[in-house]
């Protein structure tokens, strides 16, 4: 379908050292705490309401690591497709996990570190990830990373409202009909065929 990587692909499974370095920088800045709350102690949204934030702990502890989000923290950005966005991060999402209790680094941290390492300037992805963007910008700001431009595309859903994706067992695209597939995608996005496709 004409989509090719500009550089070698980064695999999160090989990037643990880079994520640990970013965690150390966040901890040095006082932006993290370790949370030993069991599932039963967390509220319905998975938010820590205990005293973990105020206890003397380090990221070396074998517990989940959370970002400290000030209660008055607000994130604003202009999405290239969805328009101006404003999220009261401290009120709506609170202290989110950046490293899980099992030692795996959370998506929010991993994608921020990898985007910065690759010099990503524009992120184009599905609108189902729009609510992840404020958390990623929050981490970018605290790590002194540049914030890329974001464009969140509408996603195709099934009759039950599920995203049409591999995860939900959608059939794979037929590479033998790439031009037709691209035309369908462009029409879904209300875009005209580019000149190179007009006679394809």
Predicted segments — roles?
Residues 12-16, 129:
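Acidic, metal-coordinating catalytic cores used for nucleic-acid/nucleotide bond scission
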Residues 21-27, 165-170:
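Short, surface-exposed amphipathic charged segments that create phosphate/polyanion-binding patches used
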Residues 24, 138, 184:
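Surface-exposed charge patches
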Residues 27, 141, 187:
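Short polybasic/polar patches that bind polyanions
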Residues 34-175, 193:
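Active-site cores that bind ATP or allylic diphosphates and position pyrophosphate for catalysis
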Residues 181, 186-188, 192:
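A conserved active-site cap/scaffold subdomain adjacent to cofactor or substrate pockets
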């Amino acid at each position: 379908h004409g989509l090719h990587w500009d550089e070698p692909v980064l695999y999160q499974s090989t990037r643990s050292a880079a994520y640990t370095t970013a965690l150390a920088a966040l901890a040095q800045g006082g932006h993290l705490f370790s949370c030993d709350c069991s599932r039963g102690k967390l509220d319905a949204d998975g938010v820590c309401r205990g005293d973990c934030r105020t206890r003397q702990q380090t990221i070396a502890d074998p517990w989940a690591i959370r970002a400290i989000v000030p209660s008055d923290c607000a994130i604003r950005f202009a999405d290239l497709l969805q328009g101006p966005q404003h999220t009261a991060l401290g009120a709506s999402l609170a202290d989110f996990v950046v490293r899980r209790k099992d030692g795996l680094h959370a998506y929010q941290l991993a994608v921020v570190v990898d985007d910065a390492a690759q010099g990503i300037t524009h992120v184009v992805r599905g609108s189902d990830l729009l609510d992840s963007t404020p958390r990623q910008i929050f981490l970018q700001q605290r790590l002194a990373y540049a914030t890329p431009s974001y464009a969140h595309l509408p996603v195709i859903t099934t009759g039950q409202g599920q995203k049409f994706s591999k995860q939900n067992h959608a059939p794979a695209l037929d590479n033998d009909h790439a031009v037709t597939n691209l035309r369908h995608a462009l029409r879904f996005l209300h875009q005209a065929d580019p000149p190179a496709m007009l006679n394809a």
